[in-house]
Amino acid sequence: MNEIREAVVQTPEQATAVIRAEALAKTYAEGKMRTPVFDGLDLSVATGETVAIVGASGAGKSTLLHLLGGLDIPTAGEVYVAGERMSALSDAQRGKLRNQSLGFVYQFHHLLPEFTALENVMMPVLLSGKNVAVAKGQALQLLESVGLGHRIDHKPSELSGGERQRCAVARALVNKPGCVLGDEPTGNLDDKTAGTVFELMLELNRAQRTSLVLVTHDRGLARRLDRVLELHQGKLRELAPSAV
């Protein structure tokens, strides 16, 4: 049996896609030089689904994640988030859609150093137009759920690496997004702490039915997600469990 199959990468029938990419292409240009990253990628992520994206360094995994999140513009093709075609939106509209429908967790936490853990997690709620009381309530609930209820008044410099990343996870989930995009979210942590943060993300995925799309080099973590997709030579292919 062929362990690797070229991915049209469809979701289960009748599932609602929180993110969909159609014929996605990205080429970088510098002067007369053209460097194609990938061409004609199709991807659909269902509500509550967890997807790992693996591949060699430089394969374009982070580029793909940025395109899915509307942080970069594809050379060709379309990305749909919560049913909205990203290319049809203005910069302001894309920003609003990202804040409402997507969460982001990176290898480095990107917490604002001058703000406390509570204030950092409140930020996306405030940006969505809700008042301070609502933002504080939602942020406190998430910080409690990630085990940081006793650290809400601490700034990032006063938190451990694992605590900072848990705070970043809380920030990503505070608006109850349809999908969280993670770029090596545990890559900067020791194995034990990485496992704790990963378990936390899976627990919140189950509790909130938030989809996860995680770029990772850790095949062990990848195997625990619903699907594993490998980006190889500009193509996405789905790996059978025994091939991961």
From Swiss-Prot:
An individual GO BP term: lipoprotein localization to outer membrane
Enzyme Commission code(s) on record: 7.6.2.-
One Pfam family matching this protein: ABC_tran
Keywords tagged on the record: ATP-binding, Cell inner membrane, Cell membrane, Membrane, Nucleotide-binding, Translocase, Transport
PROSITE patterns, per database record: ABC_TRANSPORTER_2 (PS50893), LOLD (PS51244)
UniProt record similarity statement: Belongs to the ABC transporter superfamily. Lipoprotein translocase (TC 3.A.1.125) family.
Official protein name in the record: Lipoprotein-releasing system ATP-binding protein LolD
The species this protein was found in: Xanthomonas oryzae pv. oryzae (strain KACC10331 / KXO85)
Gene field: lolD
